[in-house]
Amino acid sequence: MYESNKEEKKLNRKLFFKIFNYNFLRDRNIEYEEFRYGDNKRNYYRVYKGYDKRKPTIFFIYGGGAFRRGPRGCGAIGKFFYKYGFNVVIPSYELAPEHKYPVQIENIFSAFKHYVENNKIKKVVVMGYSSGADLAANLVYNESMKKKFNIDINIISSLITLGGTLDFSKCNSKEYEKYINKYLYSKEQIFYVNPINLIDKDSPKIPVLCIHGSKDSIVSLENSKRFIEKINKFKGKGELLILEGYKHIDLLNLFIGLGNQKTGEIMGFINRF
């Protein structure tokens, strides 16, 4: 049985303090730059320029619920990958309910396009946490958006999701019911915007790793299970990593400070492709 959301929120406080510490107090010597891709105040992205040109760029999309402060609220993750030599791009985007679907997806495509066109990029690993995984999946699988923005999928080497909202029909917690109600104009839109419904036989066959905590009471594990099942149904390259005992917020521990014992598995996946 999942533990109650109330208990999970109590446990979150300790991790949020750790995130704050690494965001603003630790590793202050690590520099970053911010670039604008549009006119809205949230239309910018933060870049940590790594030292190893052989490594891919990490394009990390945060979840709107957890990181309303945008890239400033997840600098710890940028610093983590930077210390391993990666370039890291963290795009900001306009949030619901002030801005509804498809504004967030269009923002991500605009940020990605702006970065790629202004830099010499060979490979990109797209990562998304929580609702950011929905946006990450769209960047890889939304064919109409790729055509609209003229995105070259060939530079994306892999997709990694963390506790991702990948099947809206399985987002049954109160938190995500509220999120979806704010994100969409009506529940009738769910089928058409559900990330899992983007996958078909013609979808790109890039490697995908879905990471999910076994005790995630915010986003059901079924999201990742069903997403990987559908990818592999069409002969894709999907892998599922279930982390025993992990709750939704615990996944961030993988990429803060020095990471933990499971971080190596994910870094190994990144380095394989």
Where are these regions (language model features)?
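Alpha/beta-hydrolase superfamily serine-hydrolase fold, recognizing
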Residues: 1-273
